[in-house]
């Protein structure tokens, strides 16, 4: 048995009916370990899984953490994914990177606060311009002392219907909706960005499984199983239309936000 920590309403990552792509990845991993995936569902956002579930030993592994996440012990990375620009296919704006002149022409830009997107929006002087629109994506809910998730489905819907000209999102979070819509396109953002202080702002991130910091035996067993599960994992990601980047020899460490 492999006890998997899982959020019950974190589409497209994890859904209680098992349709989340990370639910499928967990099952592929468990099969490669000759175990059965048993999901321990949690009705709060996934950002609380480490604190409220894994650390309390209510489950044993989390799918889809940034490699090197210091709250846990992470496995070898099993894929690498980018932040992307999402536009309508018929958009007249040509936006390929953060230096694209057409960025300033975008009517509304959707993004998630606390991510590389916000850092670069601040650098380019666009954060305040699109601040109110960002908060409209949660219907202006008060974010003080609580976490309010911006729905990736909603963000993609607003780009598709023309409310927004552009979204800057983590590809795994939106690829499903881009694929399903047919009128949207993703552009991988290059991983060569720096902030106002010259510090590097990563836009491509290795993804790993996470276990408790003292659970080295399980981490090692997962590492041994990843090569066996790799073909199945890559097929799941391909079906989701998530861009799969080459894993570097020295994986990038550190969280997205």
For each predicted feature, which ranges?
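A ligand-binding cleft/hinge motif common to bilobed small-molecule-binding domains
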Residues: 48-49, 55, 63-73, 123, ...
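Ligand-binding cleft/hinge of the Venus flytrap
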Residues: 26-36, 40, 80, 117-149, ...
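Solvent-exposed coil/turn segments that connect beta secondary-structure elements
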Residues: 7-10, 66-69, 80-81, 88-91, ...
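Extended ligand-binding regions for polar small-molecule ligands
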Residues: 20-33, 89-93, 98-117, 196-244
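Sec-exported extracytoplasmic/periplasmic mature domains
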Residues: 30-38, 55, 59, 90, ...
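Extracytoplasmic small-molecule ligand-binding "clamshell" domains
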Residues: 1-71, 146-149, 239-240
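Short loop->beta-strand "edge-of-pocket" segments that line small-molecule binding or catalytic clefts
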Residues: 2-8, 12, 98-128
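Periplasmic-binding protein-like
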Residues: 7-8, 80-92, 139-141, 179-226, ...
